[in-house]
Amino acid sequence: MKIAILSRNSKLYSTRRLIEAGRTRGHTVRILDPLRCYMRIAADGFSLHYKGKPITGFDAVIPRIGASVTRYGTAVLRQFEFMGTYTPNPSDAILRSRDKLRAHQLLASQGIDMPVTVFGDNPDDTQDLLSMLGPPPHVVKLNEGAQGAGVILTEKASASRGVVEALRGLYANFIVQEFIGEAEGADLRCFVVGDRVVAAMRRQAADGDFRSNLHLGGTAAMAEASPQEQDVAVRSARALGLAVAGVDLIRSQRGPLVLEVNSTPGLEGVEGVCGVDVAGTIIQHLEQAIR
């Protein structure tokens, strides 16, 4: 099998592990920087070039597209799709996952529970908008933030109004959610490949923070996801059209709640903590998908 990995940095842990796993299983693996790909679009066919040469013959493409290059990276991935190349995470699925508002609408439509979420665009409606959510604390999130960036905890109604109105003044897109205090700054990252959870880790926020992202100083330990949590994680990935996903849940009094579905989850944390060959499992999924 000939596999392309769309990645801007071949030295990143996740990219290196996918290369290693693919080659270990006897496949040809090539790294392509999506920003150096260019394409021809016409009724008579689609084509891609890279560094002056046509890109042909790939059986599968694994997107490792960073948030900063989402628009062009997904355009390149879509070109691969139109050329008949399999991908576990299609371009439209990635776009769904990176729009928090759209993702939550899709999850809710499938009966998947999450922190209650509100969204609005009219500054005159701020107080009524927040009343739809309930009393603070509230969590304000930029709609396209990543790795914990653009996430603010407000503990008073006046603070919530102030943050919402400030973000509106900056023409920022954001959502506001209820704060789940019983989670105590912890979440559960479930790594989904295909139709199952292959690894799970519990992430704990650093002292003084409520965001559990490892990039922000959080810690992680191997965890066992309950059957209900596994079901929610798999259904969440499926609802967005993703075959490979990191689904972040919090444990609440009303059961598991989905915080986010990540379409480009890092492998270093989960492989290091859980000792699971996640990269190899992703390659096995490709093999099964294109038989």
UniProtKB/Swiss-Prot annotation:
EC number, as in UniProt: 6.3.2.-
Annotated Mn(2+) 2 binding sites: E260, N262
Sequence positions that bind Mg(2+) 2: E260, N262
Co-factor: note: Binds 2 magnesium or manganese ions per subunit.
Cofactor: Mg(2+); Mn(2+)
Biological process (GO), any one: SOS response
GO cellular component: cytoplasm
Residues that bind ATP: K141, E178, F179, D187, R211, S212, N213
Chain residues that bind Mn(2+) 1: D248, E260
Domain ATP-grasp: 104-287
Statement: the UniProt record of this protein carries the keyword Ligase: yes
GO terms of molecular function: ATP binding; metal ion binding; ribosomal S6-glutamic acid ligase activity
Residues that, per the record, bind Mg(2+) 1: D248, E260
Transmembrane region(s): none
Keywords on record: ATP-binding, Ligase, Magnesium, Manganese, Metal-binding, Nucleotide-binding, Protein biosynthesis
Leading EC class: ligase
Matches recorded under HAMAP family: RimK
Family designation: Belongs to the RimK family.
Protein name as annotated: Probable alpha-L-glutamate ligase
Native source organism of the sequence: Xanthomonas campestris pv. campestris (strain B100)
Gene giving rise to this polypeptide: rimK
